[in-house]
Regions:
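Conserved alpha-helical substructure of the radical SAM core
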Residues: 1-79
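Flexible loop residues that form catalytic
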Residues: 11, 47, 91, 164, ...
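N-terminal [4Fe-4S]-dependent radical SAM core
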Residues: 10, 35-38, 225-228, 271-275
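A sequence-level detector of short linear motifs
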Residues: 77, 238-240
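Local cysteine-cluster metal-coordination motifs and their immediate loop/turn environment
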Residues: 1-12, 225, 253-263
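Radical SAM enzyme [4Fe-4S]-AdoMet core and its adjacent flexible, acidic
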Residues: 17, 24, 84-85, 89-238, ...
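Residue-level structural signal for beta-strand termini and adjacent loop
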Residues: 55, 241-244
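Radical SAM enzyme core and accessory elements
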Residues: 244-275
């Protein structure tokens, strides 16, 4: 039996699919897991999951070493026993990140990362290893990739990159397939050698993202979306993938232009939809 990566949305907000209602709760998800799945890893995302540190701690107690938290880093980071790592979304150098996420957001996230490393680097514990960065490359930040890598190399553990996945045609943030996108991927391959063991993406995955690979229109075809069970805060399965919605009438991502890291990683190592 293979393991699955599971994403639970524990935040109370997601702008495309938000509905009011009580959280499904950790115990409900735990029961579902034990009855239905053999889970290898749980990624807790949002929204902002650190609004619910209590839920994060419960998961870490239940599955120590198999929990990661995807956060925007605007809430101070706490060391949690059993947490594999924090995945902090930092979308470029200061100017680019602030343009995407709002004035002052870069300073807040950077401060919280550095404060965490300083606070918990005691008694031989290497707190920097707990921090991975997540960079979603788009039409705003793609020109500053090396500046970004240079700034964080030697401070945090790794950076994982992906490309913006559109929900609408002519999305202004989408970095289209073609010359500029190829140039960025060539640069990432070069930087992987210049800054060893820092960029988490392997060459095969990066090269995959040069063109359409997983779907047609808004339908996943070769994409192994089945390998990632994505649940929202009510415990409902999100379709077609972790950035979708349980609501079939909601706007769906354009699979044909997918740049998501987790699915392209699985595809690049041979896990594909063959049905």
């Amino acid at each position: 039996m293979y393991a699955m990566y599971v994403t639970f949305i524990v935040s109370t907000y997601w702008w495309l699919s938000r509905e009011e209602g009580e959280d499904y709760g950790f115990r409900g998800i735990e029961s579902y897991n034990k009855k239905v799945l053999q889970v290898f890893h749980v990624g807790i995302a949002g929204g902002e999951p650190l609004l619910r540190y209590d839920v994060v701690r419960l998961f870490c107690e239940e599955m120590p070493g198999h929990i990661s938290v995807i956060t925007n880093g605007t809430i101070p980071l706490q060391r949690i026993d059993g947490l594999y790592f924090y995945f902090v979304s930092l979308d470029g150098i200061k100017e680019a990140h602030n343009q995407i996420r709002g004035k002052g957001s870069y300073y807040t996230t950077r401060r919280n990362i550095l404060d965490y490393i300083k606070r918990y680097s005691t008694d031989g514990y290497k707190a920097w290893k707990d921090i991975w960065l997540s960079l979603t490359i788009n039409s705003i930040n793609y020109r500053f990739i090396e500046d970004y890598i240079k700034e964080w190399y030697g401070i945090v553990n790794k950076v994982a990159v992906q490309f913006h996945t559109p929900f609408i045609d002519d999305d202004p943030l989408m970095l289209r397939f073609g010359y500029e996108r190829d140039r960025v991927i060539d640069e990432l391959l070069m930087l992987s050698k210049k800054y060893p063991n820092f960029i988490a993406n392997k060459p095969k995955q990066l090269n995959l993202l040069r063109k359409s690979w997983g779907g047609k229109g808004r339908v996943p075809i070769a994409c192994p979306s089945w390998a990632v069970l994505a649940l929202d805060h009510m415990g409902r399965v999100k379709k077609p993938c972790c950035i979708g919605s349980h609501d079939n009438s909601a706007v769906k991502p354009i699979c044909e232009e997918c740049g998501l890291s987790i699915y392209s990683l699985l595809y690049s190592i041979g896990i594909k939809n063959t049905m």
